[in-house]
Amino acid sequence: MKQTVWNHLKLCPQGDPAQTIDDAAIAVENGRIVWLGAVRELPAQYAAWPREDLGGAWVTPGLVDCHTHLVYGGQRADEFAQRLAGVSYEEIAKQGGGIVSTVRATRAADEASLFAQSAARLEAMLAEGVTAIEIKSGYGLDLQSERKMLRVARQLGERYPVKVYTTFLGAHALPPEFASRADDYIDEVCEGMLPALADEGLVDAVDVFCERIGFSLEQSERVFNAAARHGLPVKMHAEQLSNAGGTALAARYGALSADHLEFLDEAGVAAMKEAGTVAVLLPGAYYFIRETQLPPVELLRRYGVPIAISTDSNPGTSPATSLPLMMNMATTLFRMTVPEVLRGVTCHAAQALGKADTHGTLAVGRAADFAVWSVQSLAELAYWIGRPLCERVVRGGETVHLRHAR
């Protein structure tokens, strides 16, 4: 039985800078919080427990990265350079680039190689305070390769101190072998891939890219119905490049989240509010593709729709691994406030995964998953650009990352 009191810390237990405790303590037993509050109020029963003094550092819940494509083969830096030189995305795609190049690299990689590439990205996220993450498939686009991606995601969760939730995104793009046969491919997604992967226990949720360059409303609904048959929650890449009406469909199916949302309208916002669907904003992708259409943050505020922030870590449109950087981008590009972005990477991000009861806040009975920050103010988490701020990451009461480890 391991018992520890983490003391002399500034505590932000709910991801809300308005609700903090100065000179706080957290009592942890067997990986779970049994008490938290001001040091001066520490109950006598914990007084003799071993102490870890954090020297007045800020402590927040472990960060939650709720939308990533972390597992993939290769990278697309050369295409990035081509775009900067004036080559269009369409021209790159005709040359065999774009998402097809990532599909090709992912299909070619064996599990060990895919694991090694993805582990490096996960290690970078852990070092910046992440204790829970969602990882999507969607760069395999056939049963064997989608299975491989999801198996690697599961292995990452088993071998690293980060909780991994998997999402099947077979309906991400049309693979070359199904060119001009989108309906046939959706048949394969719904009747071939999803049943097999769900039966193997590799899928926690199902996603679809509903967009003019992705899949139609009717095709997206077929994927959602297939997910329902397997008892799996759904989410959607929606309204990123146009207002295709995907958000209303996602809300009708009680989606955990709708993500991107640059072209979301008020009707879609109202539908999300009624359904309890979280808005996941992805400032890295907005920045990287030089989008100019801002997501309707003010409408989301007005309707009280929870807003999460995520890296969208992927090789094509957001090669990012830093949630604090996304916090900065969300404040500067999307005009969000510090409290909004802090909630966006903690409690609201957990809600976007359907895991608000286990992640994103610190409370008695919860796992002791938290990040320790070398800052004077929580605003610094969104203020500094490229500066390492996370001193320590604790998962289940154990230190799993220490920036100045000796």
Swiss-Prot record:
Matching entries from Gene3D superfamilies are given as:
Metal-dependent hydrolases, Urease, subunit C, domain 1
Q: Which GO terms describe its cellular component?
A: cytoplasm
Spell out the SUPFAM superfamilies in the cross-references.
Answer: Composite domain of metallo-dependent hydrolases, Metallo-dependent hydrolases
Which keywords accompany this UniProt record? Cytoplasm, Histidine metabolism, Hydrolase, Iron, Metal-binding, Zinc
List ligand-binding residues for N-formimidoyl-L-glutamate.
139, 314, 316
Among Pfam families, the record links this protein to: Amidohydro_1 (PF01979)
**Biological process, per Gene Ontology:** L-histidine catabolic process to glutamate and formamide; L-histidine catabolic process to glutamate and formate
Q: Where in the cell is it found?
A: Cytoplasm
Catalytic reaction list: 4-imidazolone-5-propanoate + H2O = N-formimidoyl-L-glutamate
- Binding annotation for Zn(2+): 67, 69, 237, 312
UniProt remark on cofactor binding = Binds 1 zinc or iron ion per subunit.
Does the keyword Iron belong to this entry? Answer: yes
Q: What is an example of a GO molecular function annotated in this UniProt entry?
A: zinc ion binding
Record-listed E.C. numbers: 3.5.2.7
Pathway field: Amino-acid degradation; L-histidine degradation into L-glutamate; N-formimidoyl-L-glutamate from L-histidine: step 3/3
Q: Where does 4-imidazolone-5-propanoate bind?
A: 76, 139, 172, 240, 317
Q: Where mainly found?
A: cytoplasm
> Which cofactors must be present for this protein to function?
Zn(2+); Fe(3+)
Under HAMAP family, the record lists: HutI
Q: Which family does it belong to?
A: Belongs to the metallo-dependent hydrolases superfamily. HutI family.
- Any idea what job this protein has? Catalyzes the hydrolytic cleavage of the carbon-nitrogen bond in imidazolone-5-propanoate to yield N-formimidoyl-L-glutamate. It is the third step in the universal histidine degradation pathway.
Q: Which NCBIfam families match?
A: hutI
Q: Which PANTHER family match?
A: IMIDAZOLONEPROPIONASE, IMIDAZOLONEPROPIONASE-RELATED
Q: What is this protein called?
A: Imidazolonepropionase
- Look up and give the organism this protein is from: Paraburkholderia phymatum (strain DSM 17167 / CIP 108236 / LMG 21445 / STM815)
From the UniProt record, report the name of the gene that encodes this protein.
Answer: hutI
